């Protein structure tokens, strides 16, 4: 059978009839199902196939049940790979990108994915960029974007800045190159303004998002409560510190303040700039080395240098040495930490390394450090108190004496969004000597196409006619911003744009009626690797756009599915490992439906999927059997009413299996726990087909296929449409009522035992008498009983029959 031709026929039908476009009827119940948009790399991979197959199954089920479904697709089309391709192949990034989009569109269609074609866009489209640039200006004017110079994560390979979230174990998230530090000007989005709301609203996502994702975001936001206080610089050190009077410190363990034996500050701390002038050459070399290390390198081993200056302990008045340490971070708290070696593993390790004294302040002097809370000693008036009690009393004392205050700190840092590359959305700002930084007024700011990409710096810096412009405010000569936006900005609001993608600027980015109807996204599908990148940014951007008045929404995604990776030979598929399976080859050999069926059957969505050629062939055989048995069906014999009493056991079993599959379908697709165990549903469908294959009763076959094809449509749509059209003119593509009578058990299975040892099973009618059951049991166990003397017959209703023999 030519499965590919059949699939192509229905794909053309769906396209011509715009079968997957949502209706403009706000009274209909809606579902917005969305899979994370792909980067147009050229060809789809099995990870794409799995992601979009899961989403498409949900979409098709809801359409069959009369939901107005929005299921769009787009392309996250800006980014470094296009520039790398330009260097490697001598092709313009725009050409490379849009050719890839066209290719991927064809592959998606060949898989039968039911995307709304009329809502498709690429994030590099000028109309999309225009709104994004307007958002940037609005955020700037609201004070949610600022520009400053800072030490930044720099990828030497991609020659661009990376946000903290884009550095994975010290390496670039995209190309895996070791990240270094570089000082540059950068635009920042003030995501920290939303830290508390982002944390608090995680509670609303419980039971709807995977707990692991919620925990990852909670830890990344990293809320901590503690004491912020000051150490005064010792009088004799003020000159070396250029009259800086004090150093501010944050601690979550105020109860350990009497154990402080040193202060650790980040190499970027303003105190270092002045005090460094008096350190010896070896320590100077160490400090400079720390400054140039990556965040990952700073975690590998503790390093530091004594600055030769002291601070005064606010309670004991003792001198405390000030050290530069690589574990002190400039962007956390004040960039200064109090070192308590007796109560902290990191502080203990550093103190031992540099022979710094250790002061024990807990009742148990053995096995330092004591990281757990204990009863204090050597802690002034707070000695003999439990740590938790002492902590509150010490904070209260500091606040009363105006020595410090209770504060909340967050690990989350503002989002740096400047990128030194060509193929990105231009930042719509003008640098004017007279007016400063001025927003562009003519949007969109588009990229020049006559550029040379050679891998040496940002091409926009070298494009004079684009770079040099006029200030929109004073009309004097000015410079255009040559940095482009981080591509994570594009993916932080695209799901909103899908609601009305054709809106022009004068009508705003979104039609609020459509936005109110379709948002939030009901089910969002993508990899867990996006937990603290895209998913956190999208939540932030939604809240920021709300505060700008564009939308009335707090959270963008109601439910989240994080699908597992596709593995082959136990490892993730990748070209470097040579274990890639080509979707094109699979489609050519087996067809789209077999690939879809295998993907859904091989593992539940959240689990890793191990590629298995024999299981794929099994899916192919199932579809073939479905076609083969359909040839025996005469659809004119189908009547929906059956009298159970007139059916034999095999016929009853066939109906039971079919309606069990229908019932299972509703359970899977409407599962409140969002596990979507499609594998169990497909197993139920296979049992139903096995039962139907034993049948010659055309009415049973007709009813069975009428129901089963509807159940299978979300998973193998081409097959379901072909056979449903052939047999029923697709009359079965509607909600079907479960015939509960078919599910009623009229038989029971009993265990048959002799002297308590299980020997067999017996299936009997549920209303069979004890005498009938014993007679049937004896017959079933005849070979065990023929030479035995039965002493006792025991019948436990609905469970077992036991014969006691001599």
Swiss-Prot record:
Main location: cytoplasm
UniProt record, GO biological process: leucyl-tRNA aminoacylation
Catalytic activity: tRNA(Leu) + L-leucine + ATP = L-leucyl-tRNA(Leu) + AMP + diphosphate
GO cellular component labels: cytosol
Top EC group: ligase
Residues spanned by motif 'KMSKS' region: 572-576
Matching InterPro entries: aa-tRNA-synth_I_CS (IPR001412), aa-tRNA-synth_Ia (IPR002300), Leu-tRNA-ligase (IPR002302), Leu_tRNA-synth_edit (IPR025709), Methionyl/Leucyl_tRNA_Synth (IPR015413), Rossmann-like_a/b/a_fold (IPR014729), tRNAsynth_Ia_anticodon-bd (IPR009080), Val/Leu/Ile-tRNA-synth_edit (IPR009008)
Subcellular location: Cytoplasm
Enzyme nomenclature, EC number: 6.1.1.4
Record's keyword annotation contains Ligase: yes
Binding-site positions, ATP: 575
This protein's record includes keyword Ligase: yes
Keywords in alphabetical order: Aminoacyl-tRNA synthetase, ATP-binding, Cytoplasm, Ligase, Nucleotide-binding, Protein biosynthesis
Motif 'HIGH' region: chain residues: 38-48
GO molecular function: aminoacyl-tRNA deacylase activity; ATP binding; leucine-tRNA ligase activity
Entry superkingdom: Bacteria
Family listed: Belongs to the class-I aminoacyl-tRNA synthetase family.
Protein name (Swiss-Prot/TrEMBL): Leucine--tRNA ligase
């Amino acid at each position: 059978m030519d499965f590919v031709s059949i699939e192509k026929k229905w794909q053309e039908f769906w396209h011509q009839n715009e079968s997957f476009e949502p209706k403009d009827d706000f009274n209909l119940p809606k579902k917005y199902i969305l899979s994370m948009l792909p980067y147009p790399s050229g060809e789809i991979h099995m990870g794409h196939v799995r992601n979009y197959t899961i989403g498409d199954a949900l979409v098709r089920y809801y359409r069959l049940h009369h939901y107005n479904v929005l299921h769009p697709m787009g392309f996250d089309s800006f980014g470094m790979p296009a520039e790398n391709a330009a260097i490697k192949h001598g092709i313009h990034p725009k050409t490379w990108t849009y050719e890839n989009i066209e290719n991927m569109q064809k592959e998606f269609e060949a898989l039968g994915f039911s995307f709304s074609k009329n809502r498709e866009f690429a994030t590099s489209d000028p109309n999309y960029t225009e709104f994004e640039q307007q958002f940037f200006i609005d955020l700037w004017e609201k004070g949610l974007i600022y520009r400053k110079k800072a030490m930044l994560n720099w990828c030497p390979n991609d020659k661009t800045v990376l946000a903290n979230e884009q550095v994975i174990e010290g390496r670039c998230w995209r190309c895996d190159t070791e990240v270094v530090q570089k000082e540059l000007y950068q635009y920042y989005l003030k995501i920290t303004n939303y830290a508390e709301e982002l944390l608090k609203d995680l509670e609303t996502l419980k039971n709807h998002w995977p707990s692991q994702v919620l925990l990852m975001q909670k830890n990344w936001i990293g809320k901590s409560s503690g004491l912020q206080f000051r150490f005064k610089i010792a009088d004799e050190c003020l000159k070396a510190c250029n009259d800086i009077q004090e150093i501010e410190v944050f601690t979550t363990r105020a109860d350990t303040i009497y154990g402080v034996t040193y202060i650790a500050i980040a190499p970027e701390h303003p105190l270092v700039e002045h005090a460094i002038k008096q350190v010896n050459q070896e320590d100077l070399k160490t400090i400079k080395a720390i400054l140039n290390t990556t965040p990952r390198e700073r975690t590998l081993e503790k390093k530091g240098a004594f600055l030769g200056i002291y601070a005064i302990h606010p309670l004991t008045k003792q001198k405390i040495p000030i050290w530069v340490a690589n574990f002190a971070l400039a962007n956390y708290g004040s960039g200064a930490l109090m070192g308590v070696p007796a109560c902290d593993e990191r502080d203990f390790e550093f103190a031992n390394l540099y022979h710094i004294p250790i002061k024990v302040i807990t009742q148990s002097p053995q096995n330092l450090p004591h990281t757990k809370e204990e009863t204090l000693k050597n802690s002034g008036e707070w000695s003999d108190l439990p740590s938790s009690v002492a902590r509150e009393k010490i904070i209260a004392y500091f606040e009363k004496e105006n020595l410090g205050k209770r504060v909340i700190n967050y690990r989350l840092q503002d989002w740096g969004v400047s990128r030194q590359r060509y193929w990105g959305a231009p930042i719509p700002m003008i640098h004017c000597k007279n007016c400063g930084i001025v927003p562009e007024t003519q949007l969109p700011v588009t990229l020049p196409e006559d550029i040379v990409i050679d891998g040496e710096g940002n091409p926009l810096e070298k494009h004079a006619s684009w770079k040099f412009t006029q200030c929109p405010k004073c009309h004097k000569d000015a410079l255009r911003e040559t940095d482009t936006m981080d591509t994570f900005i594009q993916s932080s609001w695209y799901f909103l744009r899908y609601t009305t993608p054709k809106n022009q600027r004068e009508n705003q980015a979104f039609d609020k009626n459509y936005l109110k109807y379709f948002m939030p996204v009901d089910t969002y599908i993508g990899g867990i690797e996006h937990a603290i990148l895209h998913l956190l940014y999208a939540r932030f951007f939604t809240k920021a756009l709300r505060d700008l008045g564009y939308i009335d929404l707090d959270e963008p995604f109601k439910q989240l599915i994080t699908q597992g990776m596709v593995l082959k030979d136990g490892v993730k598929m990748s070209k470097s490992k040579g274990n890639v399976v080509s979707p094109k080859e699979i489609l050519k050999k087996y067809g789209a439906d077999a690939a879809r069926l295998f993907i859904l059957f091989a593992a539940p969505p959240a689990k890793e999927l191990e590629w298995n050629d024999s299981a794929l062939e099994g899916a192919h055989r199932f579809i073939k059997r479905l076609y083969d048995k359909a040839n025996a069906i005469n659809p004119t014999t189908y009547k929906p009413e059956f009298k159970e009493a007139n059916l034999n056991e095999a016929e009853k079993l066939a109906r039971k299996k079919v309606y069990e599959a229908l019932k299972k379908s509703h359970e899977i697709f409407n599962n409140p726990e969002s596990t979507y165990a499609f594998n169990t549903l497909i197993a139920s469908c296979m049992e139903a087909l096995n039962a139907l294959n034993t049948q010659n009763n055309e009415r049973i076959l007709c009813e069975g296929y009428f129901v089963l094809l509807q159940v299978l449509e979300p998973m193998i749509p081409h097959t379901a449409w072909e056979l449903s059209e052939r047999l029923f003119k697709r009359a079965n593509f509607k909600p079907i009522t479960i015939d509960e009578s078919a599910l009623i058990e009229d038989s029971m299975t009993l265990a048959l035992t002799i002297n308590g040892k299980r020997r067999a099973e017996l299936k009997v009618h549920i209303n069979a008498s004890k005498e009938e059951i014993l007679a049937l049991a004896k017959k079933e166990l005849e070979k065990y009983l023929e030479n035995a003397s039965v002493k006792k017959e025991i019948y436990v209703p609905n469970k077992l029959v036991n014969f006691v023999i001599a």
